């Protein structure tokens, strides 16, 4: 579970395809604090740490993740919003979110409302809150 509050900006260092899976190697300020099998939200998508090497770590996205998210658009050098999972007893500064992405949307309008912004999105598909979980 995550709060939805971005903790750091990571950099995609390497992208490797293996059959239908894609391995992403990233660097960020908290890499040395990560552990294998830990969940990290990447642009809101929950991915599991599978390898750590110095100041870089690797996560793997399966075919369904690649289809339902924008991870397929990532390039080496891309900046990625990161958040480590919540801990029991920690502060909840945002909202409880899963990090399980079911679809992507297109931003069709951005409106300046004098100090805040209104975003309007369109998406296709069923009106399903959580398809799988």
Model regions and ranges:
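Conserved loop->alpha-helix
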Residues: 1-133
